[in-house]
Amino acid sequence: MSNYPNFSLTSFVECLNEIEHEFLRDKLENRPVLVRKLQELRRKTPNNVASLSYDPGTIHQIHQTTHRIKVAAKAFIRIDQSFVSLHSDAVEDTSKALKKADASSPVVGCRDLSEDLPAYHMRKHFLHTLDNPYPTQEEKEGLVRLTNESTARVGLSKANRPPLEVHQLTLWFINARRRSGWSHILKKFAREDRSRMKHLVRAKLSSSNQSTPPSSTSDSLSNNLDDVLSDNLGRPLTPVDKQQFEDDWASMISWIKYGVKEKVGDWVYDLCAASKKTPKPGMPRPVTTVAKRHPARKTKPAAKPKSRTANPRASTTPSIDSTLDSSKLESTPELSMCSTADTSFSTFGSSLSMSHYNPFQDGNDILQSPTVKARGNRKVKALPKRAGKQQPDEVENGKIPFLCLSVAFV
């Protein structure tokens, strides 16, 4: 309106059109401009309305523009009111649903694991006091009270669980320091010195960009993890030492956060006991109780003396009445001569006659064979060739020594 010094219906319509256009755009930066224009229009209009000329068309146009602005303004107001109401209802309903869910099934009791709910607050305290996980008497009583209250909120499924006591919590921390590996790190990397262990834990947490527990005394020592490890080990730090410390640390944190199933079923011990010995038929299966889970040390049975039986030895001069298996004896030229000489006449008399049997009917094959099949499936090595070879005519006419002839008959 300030751009139009002479107030008229035409300038009034143009001002309303600008307000309508900027109002429908609904930009954040246009809101102060709209407020300023509306205030100026409201201030100047009552003073100049009486001096305006009568123009029904322009007046009708002013009424239409004003009506559109009014309808749009009411719509925006309803939208804002509805949004505020819906937002409030959504926040209220969500809060009620979360409270109901927390009351019926808390996060710590959603899984039926023995270490989850009862040990939740104890594990949390262990992590917060990792540099010195030795709770005071006041802290123990507070943890016991907090744990029992959490257990009572679980519901009927845990109603038969007895309340936790202070001495049980003390035993849990003793076992937790050992099972998690905290005591192992204390012994291996801190010389079993709790002050060194405290400084080592703080250096590790500081190197991992984690918050360290508050300290009552100011530490003037170095917070560099490698320097602390090297000082505790008493020698230069090696990559193997650093890797072992990192592995032990990761294993400790994993146990504290997630833990393991601390209760092993009795069936495991029964299975181990049954696999050690074979039960007799008709005997009942032994059931391993708590008292029998650690059997007494077994003593090694005395070794039975070995029976010393003399192994039969082959004699170079066996007799005819020997009962030993002759197939196990090594045949030598002397043995062959003796054995064949003893049995040659009996074999010759019971089977064939010397005049009707030619042992060399196959030519020289028998002389080329390394062994000769004798009676009783006993193999006898053939005699080695002598230095003096037999003449061909002697072999063909059967003129060979008597000993060789005996070998063929046996």
Curated annotation (Swiss-Prot):
Q: Which domain of life is it from?
A: Eukaryota
Q: Where is this region: Variable domain between B alleles?
A: 1-110
> Which ranges of the sequence are annotated as binding DNA?
107-184
**Which ranges are annotated Polar residues under compositional bias?**
312-335
Q: Which residues does the annotated region (Disordered) include?
A: 201-239, 278-335, 374-395
The protein's location, in the record's own words, is: Nucleus
* Record's compositionally biased regions (Low complexity): 205-233
A GO term from the CC aspect? nucleus
This one is known as Mating-type locus allele B2 protein
Q: What is the lineage of its organism?
A: Eukaryota, Fungi, Dikarya, Basidiomycota, Ustilaginomycotina
